[in-house]
Amino acid sequence: FANLVEKTTYFSDKGEFEGFVAMVNKNVTLGNVIPASYKLQVYKTYDATHEGLIQSFVENGTEEVPLDGXEXX
């Protein structure tokens, strides 16, 4: 679904995230966590059409990860 992700511009609470495409491909594939803000944006963006993609983000994502990028708080 790399092509689908590239067609959309994503915005987090701190602004546009250029590496989001690579981040999505990496996290969804490896099953790592995705910051809540990015996950929510993806959820709202694909809510109407790509329900399958939503499940992937929700299952692999978490809301406990800060936007600072630091996994350990």
Swiss-Prot record:
It catalyses: Release of an N-terminal dipeptide from a peptide comprising four or more residues, with broad specificity. Also acts on dipeptidyl 2-naphthylamides. GO terms for molecular function: aminopeptidase activity; dipeptidyl-peptidase activity; metallopeptidase activity. Keywords: Aminopeptidase, Hydrolase, Membrane, Metalloprotease, Protease, Transmembrane, Zinc. Its main location: membrane. It is a multi-pass membrane protein. Optimum pH is 5.1. Binds 1 zinc ion per subunit. It comes from the Eukaryota. GO terms for biological process: proteolysis. Its cofactor is Zn(2+). It is found in: Membrane. GO terms for cellular component: membrane. Its EC number is 3.4.14.4. Purified protein is present in 2 isoforms; 76 kDa and 80 kDa. Belongs to the peptidase M49 family. Degrades neuropeptide proctolin (RYLPT) by cleavage between Tyr and Leu residues. This is Dipeptidyl peptidase 3.
